[in-house]
Amino acid sequence: MSVVEGARVDAGAGEVPARLDGRLRLVLVVLLVAQFMLAVDFSILNVALPVIGDGLGFSLSNLQWIATSFALCAAGFTLLFGRVADLFGRRRLFLVGLAVLGLSSLVGGLATSPEMLIAARVFQGLATAAGTPARLSPLPTSFPDRPSRQKALGLIGALMSAGFTTGAILGGVLTDLLSWRWAFFINVPVALAVLFIAPTVIKESRPATRPKLDVPGATAVTLGLLALIYGLTQAGEHGWGAPSALGWLAAGVVLLIVFYAIESKSSAPLVPVSVLKKKTVAWGNIAGLVAFLTETSLVFLMTLYLQEVLDFSPLTAGLSFGVLGVGTVIGGSIAPRVIGAVGTRSTLIVGGVLQAVATLSLVALGETSASMWLLLVATFAGGVGNMLVIVGFMVTATTGLPDHEQGMATGLATMTQQIGITMGTPIMSAVAAANTDIHAGITTAVIVNTAIVVVGILTTVLFLRTKAAKDVAAAG
């Protein structure tokens, strides 16, 4: 049955969501812990960057590479590793990714030079790219019935967004109370625990027919994404008109066009063009891109507001996002029931509208702490709405595909998440920096953020329609 149009999300008529038995709950806990840990790594160092720069001797111009080196690898290599998971085993790649993440986190915490730290961040990004699609693609075999899989997708989606928010909080707490090095060290025991438990509870899975690795396509899409994301970081640092930004963005677009052309002719494409043409895949991923781009960049804007306008400490600013984290967890927890009641398309629309209204209300923030009540209420409501969209996107973009394409589909969905996280901050930073008054710049960026959410709603309303629902039903 359809998961897009107003149909209920059931495996059969009248079916209610399945209860998870003890083993499935343990599998889900392992996947959730890994998801949360990888999501935290996207933002945990943000508030600690000045302290790290002073401690290791980073120049101001090179400080951005602590975040950029991680984001480039995490987003740029995700699709490639999604297919590698199909080739060599999803559980195997999941475990390898976790091991590399734990080791690189240890190296990062022990870093004594900028080069050593950047190398650790590169391997953290690669581990994230390897671990994320490999972690999500076992869902069809671990949770073969649709209701239990939707529960898992809802919780995993919630943890992705909540982990990003928690990273901002945790980074401030660890840096303020202990040392920035603990932002790295905290990954090590978690990775070891998951590595100890995962082999006993997660089944190995790979397609029945071993697919070939599309080397030209993999090269084109990886280089294209790297160029595109690097161009966005250059735009955030130097402005949208900077030659370096325009050059890298143009190169990224050209390479992605080349990738599409390669996939159209390949006998064993990395991403079958027929899959990309499915409305559920295409527009579901567009909705996810908008959700992650806007909410994570809003955290950046509100961090800027709290520290630069209200003069809060990094610790206080980080703790202020606790209500946003609660909102995302609640939104992710109720999303499967909302989808079951009204369908994925309506859930995407309702969540988007709630997020847009909550975000737009932030234009009323003043220059005193009296505005904190508005920030807390708006970020909570926006977090709930954002998670409805994220879970709706995950269900839409990964449902109705055969098992041998699950690694690719989850790789696409994960790449969408990570590109959204990577794109958001440079875009909003460039918008905010265009105004010499920091408060006015933040207000303008909030309006732009809201407009992007509205565009996401409109694409869902206009393009994710009945035909897409039939496509999913036919494929499922």
Spans of model-derived segments:
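Transmembrane-helix bundle of Major Facilitator Superfamily
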Residues: 2-200, 342, 348-356, 360-367, ...
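Residue-level signal for pocket-adjacent positions within structured domains
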Residues: 15, 33, 89, 134, ...
